[in-house]
Amino acid sequence: MNIKSLLLGSAAALVAASGAQAADAIVAPEPEAVEYVRVCDAYGAGYFYIPGTETCLRISGYVRYDVKGGDDVYTGSDRKGWDKGARFALMFNTNSETELGTLGTYTQLRFNYTSNNSRHDGQYGDFSDDRDVADGSVSTGTDLQFAYITLGGFKVGIDESEFHTFTGYLGDIINDDVISAGSYRTGKIAYTFTGGNGFSAVIALEQGGEDVDNDYTIDGYMPHVVGGLKYAGGWGSIAGVVAYDSVIEEWATKVRGDVNITDRFSVWLQGAYSSAATPNQNYGQWGGDWAVWGGLKYQATQKAAFNLQAAHDDWGKTAVTANVAYELVPGFTVTPEVSYTKFGGEWKNTVAEDNAWGGIVRFQRSF
């Protein structure tokens, strides 16, 4: 009996001790669920949700290397060797939905390296040749090329002028602006109305910017003004823009038509007129009162596209360029291009040679 009581008492003591230890034990919290990156397919391929938000982000860019030879078709000068250029561009897009429409941003950073012909006439570096032209140079630079915000149809920030973007660029050509259709980068506030029937309209207030050695920014509170109308359908599109340069108090206009002949072959034609017959302005930078551009694109195969552009202005400059863009593998395109410029009329006395032939090969990896 005493042994039984002893055993029962020992068991009770052990149970009590176990309960006390359990009461003192630290209970580890349940691990929080890990929030993995989610794919966002509302705005196209490549977007994902920024963790903890409903904002979609896409990161993209390209690495490019250009090799140029022959003449400079913009100036008529002989390169006397190879010119090289490299660029790394990094782009960020964000989008989210609000009660006022889609709120978006776009930024692009460019890291550039250029190396001009560094050895000819027996000299090196920054010496000059017999024409007092620099014997060679290397330059690097970093630019915030684009940085703008969009909300519905509104856009504000650093972008390219609506004088270019609304009508469309001058073909899929590298040397596309030998005859310039206006300056590009500018600060602006713009609104684009897009109807459901293919009709759209734009109005923009622009600051202007620097282009090569010229400054076309406004000199007071009055901005440059751009307005345009467009109609687009399955057959193509027709668009027109009018721009007022507040510095020289003159205007310029462009009208462009695009036609899709087939799903692989398209053509386009653009005409322009300026009230000031000088290239030294923000918009009408061709020579004289008028200029015309035209081109075509033919998708020869799934990998190869042929592009052609021709242009002529009132002062007598003629430019023709052709290339073949070949996608070697997905994301990597090689583009050989040949350009010719005839400097006639009033351009003839501004260049060393009347005729210029130049070539370029571009290697570009896009991601």
Swiss-Prot record:
What are the UniProt keywords, alphabetically?
A: Cell outer membrane, Ion transport, Membrane, Porin, Signal, Transmembrane, Transmembrane beta strand, Transport
Locations listed in the record = Cell outer membrane
The terms under GO molecular function for this entry are:
porin activity
Could you confirm whether the keyword Signal appears in this record? yes
Q: Which membrane topology term applies here?
A: Multi-pass membrane protein
A single cellular component GO annotation: cell outer membrane
The protein's matches in Pfam families, at most eight in alphabetical order, are given as:
Porin_2
Task: Give the signal peptide range.
Answer: 1-22
**Which GO BP terms, alphabetically?**
monoatomic ion transport
What is known about its subunit structure? Homotrimer.
Instruction: Please state what the annotation says regarding this protein's domains.
Output: Consists of 16-stranded beta-barrel sheets, with large surface-exposed loops, that form a transmembrane pore at the center of each barrel. The pore is partially ocluded by a peptide loop that folds into the pore lumen.
Query: What does the protein in this record do?
Result: Forms passive diffusion pores that allow small molecular weight hydrophilic materials across the outer membrane.
* Family, as annotated: Belongs to the alphaproteobacteria porin family.
Listed name of the protein: Porin Omp2b
